[in-house]
Amino acid sequence: MEFILSVVGSLLLVICVLVSVAFLTLLERKVLGYIQIRKGPNKVGLMGIPQPFCDAIKLFTKEQTYPLLSNYLSYYISPIFSLFLSLIVWMCMPFFVKLYSFNLGGLFFLCCTSLGVYTVMVAGWSSNSNYALLGGLRAVAQTISYEVSLALIGFKILLFSLL
């Protein structure tokens, strides 16, 4: 019974995160509309609330294109794996009801966020383009340099919370 509740809680968390991201993009588009002195996406439905769902339908019905010489499977699996990793990170966050509580949650967070950058490199490599590969390697180098400072800040917070 506890396993079923944790699975239902995890699915509910993932759905809430995805819907909140959709409405944050709606908020971003409205703010950009006000900044640029134009009408934002508030023409669909009541105050533009159905706009994220219309955007999702549009994205799912678009034609899929891929580079001619690319490695098709890894080219399309890497963004899916990146989304999966970013949703898994939410599972270790401490909420009111603990979904998955374990002692090394901070280390799990750092590991999942560090794995996310390699999906960009795999996507660049699988496109068989030198420029995409260089972009992927540049993203890996940049993210690794930021992860060191993130880990040091996290360990500093952990150290001061134990004192």
UniProtKB/Swiss-Prot annotation:
GO MF annotation terms: NADH dehydrogenase (ubiquinone) activity
UniProt keywords, alphabetically: Electron transport, Membrane, Mitochondrion, Mitochondrion inner membrane, NAD, Respiratory chain, Translocase, Transmembrane, Transmembrane helix, Transport, Ubiquinone
The reaction(s) annotated as catalysed by this protein in its Swiss-Prot or TrEMBL entry are:
a ubiquinone + NADH + 5 H(+)(in) = a ubiquinol + NAD(+) + 4 H(+)(out)
| Entry keyword Transmembrane | yes
Subcellular localization(s) per the UniProt record = Mitochondrion inner membrane
* Topological type in the membrane: Multi-pass membrane protein
| Predominant location | mitochondrion
Q: Which Pfam families match?
A: NADHdh (PF00146)
Query: Keyword Iron, does the record have it?
Result: no
Q: Where are the transmembrane segments?
A: 3-23, 77-97, 104-124, 143-163
Broadest EC class?
translocase
Q: Which GO terms describe its biological process?
A: aerobic respiration
List cellular component terms (GO). Answer: mitochondrial inner membrane
- What domain of life does the native source organism fall in? Eukaryota
**E.C. number:** 7.1.1.2
PANTHER family per UniProt: NADH DEHYDROGENASE SUBUNIT 1, NADH-UBIQUINONE OXIDOREDUCTASE CHAIN 1
Family assignment from sequence similarity: Belongs to the complex I subunit 1 family.
Q: What does this protein do?
A: Core subunit of the mitochondrial membrane respiratory chain NADH dehydrogenase (Complex I) that is believed to belong to the minimal assembly required for catalysis. Complex I functions in the transfer of electrons from NADH to the respiratory chain. The immediate electron acceptor for the enzyme is believed to be ubiquinone.
What is the protein name stated in its UniProt record? NADH-ubiquinone oxidoreductase chain 1
Record organism:
Drosophila bifasciata (Fruit fly)
Gene of this entry? mt:ND1
